[in-house]
Amino acid sequence: MARSADIDINAGARLDRLPTCGFHWRILALIGAGMFLDAFDIYLAGGVLGAVLKDGWSTLELNAAFVSATFVGMTIGAWLSGILGDRFGRRFSYQMNLAIFGLASIAAAFAPNMMVLIVLRFIIGIGLGAEIVVGYATLTEFVPAASRGRWIGLLAVITNFSLFASSMVGLWVIPTLGWRYMFGLVGILAMVVWILRKSMPESPRWLAANGRADEAEDILSAIEAEAARKGPLSAVVASVPAQESAGSVWRLFQPPYLARTLLGSLLHIVVGFSLYGFIGWLPSFMVKGGHSVVSSLGYTSVMALGGPVGSLIGLVLADRLGRRLSIVGSSIAAAVLGLAYPHMADGIALAAVGFLLVTAIYVMLATGFAMHVPELFPTRYRLR
C-alpha cells in the first residue's frame, strides 16, 4: 500500500538523526555552486556599470534603471519561486531559476545597447531572486536540525565569497577583455552547474508533505544507507506533523505567522538596501567622482573582503551568541559605520571603513537572511 503522509515515514526525524556524510557535502556543493554564481551575477553589476558609464555607453539614469530592473526582477523571481517550489517541488524551482539567469546572462553579453541590457537584466533578476530563496530553504530541509546553523553558515560563506571573487575577476577581466565577458563567464558556468544539479534529489520533507511518501521513502532510504556506512544510526524519534495544508499565501499574514512574516520582511529589506544599494552603486559613484575604472574596482575589491569575513564571523557568532543577538549587534555596527563612511576623506580610510561596513552587513546577512528567516517557517510555507 502506498504511503500518504509524513507521519508514516517520519521524514523530518529521519533526516535530523543522520550524522554528517558525503551526501550532505554533495548537497552543499551543488546548492553552493548555484548560490555562488547567483551572487556573482548580482555583484558583477557594480564593475559593469562603472565601465559602461566611463565608456559613455550609459548614463547615471540608465544605470539606475539597470539596478531597478535587477531588483524588480528579483522580487518577482522570489515570489514566483515560492509558489512554484511549493506546487511543483524544490528541484523544479532551483533548476528553472538557474536556467533563467544563466541563459539570460549569456544573452546579455551580446546586448547591442543599454536598453536591451536593462531588459535582459530584468529577466536575469527573476532567476537571481528565485535562486536566493530556494537555495537556503532547500539546504535547510536536507540537513539535520542540530547542525543546521553551521550548514547554512557554510552556504553563506560560499555564497558571499562571490563578492570578493567578482571584484577580483572584474579587476582583471573588465579593463582587459571588456564587461561583456563578465556576463558570458557567469552564464556559461551557470549552465554547467545546471547540468550537474540534475543529479540532485527532491526534498524528502516536501515529498512527504505533499502526499508523495513512496518517493520520499526511496530518497530517505538511499541517504540512510550512505550515512550508515559510518556506523549504526540512532533511533528515530517519532514526530507528528501538523495537519494544516499549505493553503493560501495570505495565511502568512495571520497568527501565528504574521509576526514571523513581518520580521522576515524587515530583515530582507534592511539587508537588501544595505548590501545591494551600497555595493552595487559604489564603482559608479567612484567613476563619477573622478576615479579610474581600475582604481574604483581596486577599492571595491578591498571592501569586498568583508563578504567572506563577515560570513565566517556570522557562522561563529550564530552558534555562540545566538541568531537574535548576532543580528542586533551587526545591525548596530552597520548603522554606525554607514554614518561614518561618507565622511572618510582619503582612500585608505575609505577602504578600511568600507571593509568594516561590508563585514557588518554580511554578518547580518548570514545570521538573519540565511539562518534565521528559513527557520521561522515550517516546510509548507518556507518558500513563500
Residue spans of the language-model regions?
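Transmembrane-helix signature of 12-pass secondary carriers
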Residues: 1-384
